[in-house]
Amino acid sequence: MSALDDSIRVEVKTEYIEQQSSPEDQKYLFSYTITIVNLGEQAAKLETRHWIITDANGKISEVQGAGVVGETPTIPPNTAYQYTSGTVLDTPLGIMYGTYGMVSESGERFKATIKPFRLALPGLLH
């Protein structure tokens, strides 16, 4: 664990995309908007992502790759980077979590944690 691990805060907002979903075919599309806030004193570049996505049946999908939405943004201190992406689940409920592989401007590699967040149809849970 790096001292820089806590220098990045990840905020998430999710939305069910009804018009592009097909419940009769067990296809539920969710978008998620991620805001990555650099609370540190150095710029930090997002190099990789690692997601673990679990649906209500316990089916686990893992997604790893370079950057996010085709970008590897450098986030200056006290600023934020935001993007929107999506995922399709076989069930109306699931969770996602993971990490971003980051590198500071001084070259130190560290992980930014993406805490678990829920993907759910509106009104499904109270």
UniProtKB/Swiss-Prot annotation:
Disulfide bonds: none annotated. It comes from the Bacteria. One of its GO terms (biological process) is error-free translesion synthesis. It holds the Pfam family DUF525. SUPFAM superfamilies: ApaG-like (SSF110069). It comes from Shewanella sp. (strain MR-4). InterPro entries: ApaG_domain (IPR007474), ApaG_sf (IPR036767), Uncharacterised_ApaG (IPR023065). The gene is apaG. This is Protein ApaG. Residues 2-126 form the ApaG domain.
